A protein has these predicted regions:
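Cytosolic, long alpha-helical scaffolding segments
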Residues: 1-213
Length: 213
């Protein structure tokens, strides 16, 4: 069902769109915390884990409400599958943000230049997705532009990821360095997976925009 048939100028946001906005904002808040930690802005690893976990819990609650409302609502402003999948991918982004820090803590891995770039770019992608969801009702074409920017940023993350992996293999010349490489590669993969989810969220937004304009 097209969004233009449900929304009118000046009307309050539909509850599903508002829940998606709230969820995207929580994800952005979490990635803001992560990016600041990578820039060494006086946040301890333990404190970051607690704060990221709190954001994750808040976002999960929003998603639970959204799914419950989907079950109890006959007519939705967007296709049910699109609402569900967009919420899922946004949720996964924050989950991977948390598990990135958790894995770094468990594997005793410090941040490096590649991780700093990847996380900063992911934070920007999350910001574009949050803007896309906010513009979806009144300005779907603008929402599509933000979704395309998010996809471009995801491509940048994957390029940094490939460069980082290549550099790791070049440095691994003995057993200890090999173990370090394997641990660090695991962290890179967490951020790469986060980027994949951002790309999937952007794809869903693109499909929504095509249906409503």
């Amino acid at each position: 069902m097209g969004i233009t048939g449900v929304f009118k100028r000046g009307q309050k946001e539909d509850k599903f769109v508002q829940l998606l906005i709230d969820q995207a904002d929580k994800t952005l808040e979490g990635l803001n915390l992560l990016e600041k930690w990578f820039r060494k802005e006086k946040v301890s690893e333990e404190s970051l884990l607690d704060k990221m976990r709190a954001k994750e819990v808040e976002a999960d609650e929003i998603r639970r409400i959204l799914i419950d409302d989907l079950h109890n609502t006959f007519v939705t402003p967007l296709d049910r599958e699109d609402i569900f999948n967009l919420s899922l991918h946004i949720d996964d982004m924050l989950d991977y943000g948390y598990t990135t820090v958790e894995a770094m803590h468990m594997l005793e891995i410090d941040e490096d230049a590649h991780l700093q770039k990847m996380v900063a770019t992911m934070r920007d992608a999350a910001a574009e997705l949050a803007l896309a969801v906010k513009r979806l009702s009144a300005n779907p074409r603008v929402a599509g532009e933000h979704a395309r920017r998010a996809k471009k940023l995801e491509n940048e993350v994957e390029q940094i990821y490939r460069e980082a992996i290549a550099e790791l293999f070049q440095k691994a010349t003995d057993f200890n360095e090999l173990m370090e490489m394997l641990r660090r590669r695991e962290i890179y993969r967490h951020v790469s997976n986060m980027a994949d989810r951002a790309n999937q969220a952007a794809d869903v937004l693109g499909m929504i925009v095509m249906k409503v304009i």
